[in-house]
Swiss-Prot record:
Cellular component per GO, a single term: cytosol
InterPro entries in the record: ARM-like, ARM-rpt_dom, ARM-type_fold, GASP1-3
Function description: May play a role in regulation of a variety of G-protein coupled receptors.
Keywords: Deafness, Disease variant, Phosphoprotein
Compositional bias segments (type: Basic residues): 255-271
Domain of life of the native organism: Eukaryota
Name used for this protein in its record: G-protein coupled receptor-associated sorting protein 2
Organism of origin: Homo sapiens (Human)
Disease per record: Deafness, X-linked, 7: A congenital form of bilateral mixed or conductive hearing loss, which is progressive in some patients. Additional clinical features include ear anomalies and facial dysmorphism with bilateral ptosis.
Tissues of expression: Expressed in the brain.
Region of interest called Disordered, as start-end residue ranges on this chain: 1-122, 218-292, 349-368, 531-552
Similarity comment text for this entry: Belongs to the GPRASP family.
């Protein structure tokens, strides 16, 4: 049966596709679109694929229904016989692969139900698979056997040493032997090589199977099916798998290695639609897609759809290109032809090879593995071919040819070809990897991507991809300038919005200036009437509305920051202007920083790296907000003096001595903790300084803030007499701070006795006069309210049973009389007419 020849009439006549070429052979172009060309030898076209309806002889794969012979892979349902792989349901006799139900006798494949006797094929079902698939012309050529017979004989001819010719060995035994035994060392190579003889593209059919198999399947097919599903095709693709199309061992390995390097089965065959081979590049798109590539009956074109070219007809062009390439020893074309072979197209590409040198491509591939030089020479073509095989799954049925064409015609599009082969439906990752490595030394990375990038997904290449994200500048130009028209005309008008950055040297102007509302400007320009009597520098702390706490920042605006140049200009303008007419609420004016002091401040900050001191500098520059106490402390001590003191810098400033003494004081009270010792020292230093001096004022302000909690009230109350004396001798501003401190103490019943002593009450009552500031009077009234609340609550009796209310009661009565008189005086001042009438 192995030697039996299939009659030309027995071969099914696939429909002739437009552009399909008929190869010189026993079959005519019209009758058999897949013509076998005696390209190489009469060896069985193991691994050949029928174009569409053609049945595959050993190593041939039917596109859809054909059964697989040994070395051929059934699509899905075929059962594996010795050396054969069942597609799914069909049972295969050794060397044969049934697609569905048909059983193949040795070397013969039935399309559907028909059973093929080895070497014999039903006319309709057994299309000259040899011819259609691989252009079995090689087989008939070598043996003089009809192409049909050549195809029929098993793949067993592999290097097992029994290279059966079309008539040689029985299909069954050969196939079985080939799968199990003949290919032990070189799984794919031996079985397929017999086809075209050593060095030839014998593997073309076998490795060309469109449907990729699970690696398990690989084992069955005459060694072509490597464990990784390299099968003829797979072996070709798998790393060192034997020749893809029953090539000579070296050549086969070369190709397979070449591809296997990066792709296990880069384009061995797509499992589903994508399996179409580029090889089927006959003029008819349908042939190329249906015949052998798509065992499932899908168009090979999808698989091979070139990413760049998606024209179905391309493959015809490609075929020509491939042929040229094969002749020029381009592995790519060879691959395309070898694995894409639809009947005629396979022949055509083989023909070209035969004409030029069918073995050339195979050798080239084999040599490539062996010889890196060859690999470099042919890499692009081969990659292109590979791309066709894996890249385009389900794109166009007619693309099978197109993909092939791309591979051939565009050696530069290596990644395209490789992408296609590696990309296929389920085996994309494995397919792409093998093909790329060898084919493209330059674009190896590009080729490889196809194999690993998409898992079970179609490749989709966009020539003009949109960026995933738009890159935008993260930083604004520091040198960006504001338009002169948008700049504030006066300092009262606007301040620049705070922008974090260096606090000296280079300032960062705000790019979004904002104008202060008119109400705010009016308040900045003129203080309310009721603030006229306020002590200097304490206007914001006025108690005009005792029920509402004063805001931390005027108008609740964020701190503003100006550049160094702007601050210099502003300070010079303030010095040149009259102090009475100058009104500004900026931090520099609040801290009373002069031009000379500001320059010293900048010099210090250039030399200092202490983070704590930098925080102070940020406050002075307006870059950082600060509490009122902190601002007052910096203002009273002087920003430069404060920094020098903290750094132990020598300074000639008089006011620095206070800070030095305060910071470097000796703890005279061993029984007190550090903070308590510090508070006692501050009280002593404050009272020791001259009245109304800056050092004294600074100490009082510090104590005022320390009395916000009751923890230190008792300590400070010990110095009550000294602070009460200041209420009689100090100016309005010093009185204000002393009264604010005493107001905090008045809330604590524990110190009420000392605070409201007879001496204290007389001093408080003496403050009710027309000459005293309204703020100070308001504070005294608030103090009496606090003590009144303490007495009413009964807390006073619990703390001190000896506390006498008589002095307080008399003080309250006197206080009421003074309050009425004071109110009358104020009313008379506000309404002169009423004063005259009275």
């Amino acid at each position: 049966m192995t030697g039996a020849e299939i009659e030309p009439s027995a071969q099914a006549k696939p429909e002739k596709k437009a552009g399909e070429e008929v190869i010189a052979g026993p079959e005519r172009e019209n009758d058999v679109p897949l013509v076998v060309r005696p390209k190489v030898r009469t060896q069985a076209t193991t691994g050949a694929r029928p174009k569409t309806e053609t049945k595959s002889v050993p190593a041939a794969r039917p596109k859809t229904e054909a059964q697989a012979m040994s070395g051929a892979r059934p699509k899905t349902e075929v059962q594996v016989m010795g050396g054969a792989r069942p597609k799914t349901e069909a049972q295969g006799i050794t060397g044969a692969r049934p697609k569905t139900d048909a059983r193949a006798v040795g070397g013969a494949r039935s399309k559907t139900d028909a059973k093929a006797i080895p070497g014999a094929r039903p006319k309709d079902e057994a299309q000259a698979w040899a011819q259609s698939e691989f252009g079995t012309e090689a087989v008939s050529q070598a043996e003089g056997v009809s192409q049909t017979n050549a195809v029929a004989w098993p793949l067993a001819t592999a290097e097992s040493g029994s290279v059966t010719k079309s008539k040689g060995l029985s299909m069954d035994r050969e196939l079985v032997n080939v799968d199990a035994e003949t290919f032990p060392g070189t799984q794919g190579q031996k079985g397929i090589q017999p086809w075209f003889g050593p060095g030839e593209e014998t593997n073309m059919g076998s490795w060309c199977y469109s449907r990729p198999r699970a690696r398990e399947e690989a084992s069955n097919e005459s060694g072509f099916w490597s464990a990784d599903e390299t099968s003829t095709a797979s072996s070709f693709w798998t790393g060192e798998e034997t020749s893809v199309r029953s090539w000579p061992r070296e050549e086969s390995n070369t190709r397979s290695r070449h591809r296997a390097k990066h792709q296990t089965n880069p384009r061995s065959r797509p499992r589903s639609k994508q399996e179409a081979y580029v090889d089927s590049w006959s003029g008819s798109e349908d042939e190329a897609s249906n015949p052998f590539s798509f065992w499932v009956g899908e168009n090979t074109n999808n698989l091979f759809r070139p990413r760049v070219r998606e024209e179905a007809n391309i493959r015809s062009k490609l075929r020509t290109n491939r042929e040229d390439c094969f002749e020029s020893e381009s592995e790519d074309e060879f691959y395309k032809q070898s694995w894409v072979l639809p009947g005629e197209e396979a022949n055509s590409r083989f023909r070209h090879r035969d004409k030029e040198d069918p073995n050339t491509a195979l050798k080239l591939r084999a040599q490539k593995d062996v010889d890196s030089d060859r690999v470099k020479q042919e890499p692009r073509f081969e990659e292109e071919v590979i791309i066709g095989s894996w890249f385009w799954a389900e794109k166009e049925a007619s693309l099978e040819g197109g993909a092939s064409a791309i591979c051939e015609s565009e050696p530069g599009t290596e990644e395209g070809a490789i992408g296609g082969s590696a990309y296929w439906a389920e085996e994309k990752s494995s397919l792409g990897a093998v093909a790329r490595e060898e084919a493209k030394p330059e674009s190896e990375e590009e080729a490889i991507f196809g194999s690993w990038f998409w898992d079970r997904d179609e490749a989709c290449f966009d020539l003009n991809p949109c960026p995933v994200y738009k890159v935008s500048d993260r930083f604004r130009d520091a040198a960006e300038e504001l338009n002169a028209s948008s700049r504030p005309q006066t300092w009262d008008e606007v301040t620049v919005e705070f922008k974090p950055g260096l606090f000296h040297g280079v300032g960062f102007r705000s790019t979004s200036p904002f104008g202060i509302p008119e109400e705010a400007s009016e308040m900045l320009e003129a203080k309310p009437k009721n603030l006229e009597l306020s002590p200097e520098g304490e206007e914001q702390e006025s108690l005009l509305q005792p029920d509402q706490p004063s805001p931390e920042f005027t108008f609740q605006y964020d701190p503003s920051y100006r550049s160094v140049r702007e601050i210099r200009e502003h300070l010079r303008a303030r010095e040149s202007a009259e102090s009475e007419s100058w009104s500004c609420s900026c931090i520099q004016c609040e801290l009373k920083i002069g031009s000379e002091e500001f320059e010293e401040f900048l010099l210090l900050m250039d030399k200092i790296r202490d983070p704590f001191i930098h925080e102070i500098s940020k406050i002075a520059m307006g870059m950082r907000s600060a509490s009122q106490f902190t601002r007052d402390f910096i203002r009273d001590s002087g920003v430069v003096s404060l920094i020098e003191t903290l750094l132990n810098y020598p300074s000639s400033r008089v006011r620095t001595s206070f800070l030095e003494n305060m910071i470097h004081m000796a703890p005279p009270y061993p029984n007190l903790n550090m903070i308590e010792t510090f508070i006692c020292q501050v009280c002593e230093e404050t009272l020791a300084h001259s009245v109304d001096s800056l050092e004294q004022l600074t100490g009082i302000r510090m104590l005022r803030h320390l009395t916000m909690t009751i923890d230190y009230h008792t300590l400070i109350a010990n110095y009550m007499s000294g602070f009460l004396s200041l209420l009689t001798t100090a100016n309005a501003r010093t009185k204000f701070h002393v009264l604010k401190m005493l107001l905090n103490l008045s809330e604590n019943p524990a110190v009420a006795k000392k605070l409201f002593s007879a001496k204290a009450l007389s001093i408080f009552v003496g403050l009710f006069n027309i000459e005293e500031t309204n703020d100070n009077i308001q504070i005294v009234i608030k103090m009496f309210q606090n003590i009144s609340n303490i007495i009413k609550s009964g807390k006073m009796s619990l703390i001190d049973d000896d506390f006498s209310l008589e002095p307080l009661i008399s003080a309250f009565r006197e206080f009421e009389e003074l309050a009425k008189q004071l109110q009358a005086q104020i009313d008379n001042q506000n309404d002169p007419e009423v004063g005259q009438q009275s």
